[in-house]
Amino acid sequence: MNQPPSSLPRLGQWNGPEDLFSLQEKQLQQTVAWAARSPFYRERLNAAALPTTAADLASLPLTTKQDLRDNYPFGMLAVPKERLATYHESSGTAGQPTPSYYTAEDWVDLAERFARKWIGISAEDIFLVRTPYALLLTGHLAHAAGRLHGATVVPGDNRSLAMPYARVVRVMHDLGVTLSWSVPTECLIWAAAATAAGHRPATDFPALRALFVGGEPLTDARRRRISRLWGVPVIEEYGSTETGSLAGECPHGRLHLWADRALFEVYDPRTGTVRAEGEGQLVVTPLYREAMPLLRYNLEDNVSVSYDDCACGWNLPTIQVLGRASFGHRVGSATITQHRLEELVFSLPDAYQVVFWRARAEPTTLRIEIEVPEEHRAAAEAELAASVQAAFDVDSEVTGLPAGTLIPHHALTAMPDVVKPRSLFGPDEDWGKALLYY
């Protein structure tokens, strides 16, 4: 497709933080004006004194996920409905829908932000999109970004019976997939499925250039393991259904916030204070969103933000995503987080072949199960238990399991029979699948 560039800000159009802040404030007045058109913000804002600077904006209450749920479906809508291009809902587990919607103009911004990959996306690429489509944004977003630059998109989904892991591996191998988009865990499962199919991930997929990943916190240790398994760079992306892409990785491996397209704050929920950098929860104000403007939207993701220099020259703040505060669990007096525990698991020697694991935090003990070949089981159990003790000062029970225990072999190799709905069956056919086709 290779559409001409839009008039939105592009990388390299500013020099340093001051230029960046000036760019943000130049757009902020328009952003607030758009927001004032929605029923939610019309009630929250003082029409006679709309915020015009970042300092003014900081006086407004945070917008929360609950605000979005309470205003389902269109209480946040700031344009006529006929201007909407798509409607989405996030994948949260709160039980209430969290809506998001975008105009065609919003989609230009969305696709451009996602496509800011240092390795590039071009018409020569075959791009496997292996995240959900349906009501979620993620699959549609990657698809749009790929087409924006002319890539051939393979819409793999990852919540479809029509695309089991065996088919993912076949498509990657036979089509010569060059780029993929998925959660990091998928890349590990593909490697296992490829091995089960008789392939060597690092050598039998020569067209593969990079793995784009996002959707879960990713430690350096797991990233390095995935990269070694496949022999290509792992390039991280960070965002949400409510906002689209918020950060991407530069050639030097650092994750940068797209602060030319959004205004970011770091919120300390203990004190209620906000600042431009440091550790806390990420608060975002997208600057170029018409359909559903968000002012000071709290993503509730724990992050660390800094404005230190980076050799890439993008002059954008860097971010480390630490996950959700609610994802930590107590064992004794220690708080165990998946991020810290993952770093320990993937710091085990590659020779142990530990990539699949799970853990349960109990009152006095951390129970961990890992898939590991029998010849490495005792060493892996002992080393991981020692690492947990050193990192958290808690007792742990590490159990090595045979391959196929946590990720069953049939999940890697099965090809489900996906059929259209039928009502009439022959005498020897299974009519249990009538109407409910699966």
Name the predicted role of every residue range.
Residues 154-157, 161, 235-237, 397-407:
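General small-molecule cofactor/ligand-binding pocket signal
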Residues 209, 218, 222-309:
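Conserved AMP-binding/adenylate-forming
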Residues 1-89, 94-109, 113-116, 174, ...:
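Nucleotide 5′-phosphate-binding alpha/beta core
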Residues 9, 66-207, 217-225, 229:
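Active-site phosphate/ATP/adenylate-binding loop shared across adenylate-forming ligases
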Residues 173-182, 229-233, 254-263, 420-426:
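A polyampholytic, Gly/Pro-enriched intrinsically disordered region
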Residues 213-216, 356:
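Glycine-rich beta-strand-to-loop/alpha-helix junction loops that act as flexible
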Residues 180, 283-396, 419:
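AMP-binding/adenylate-forming catalytic core of the ANL superfamily
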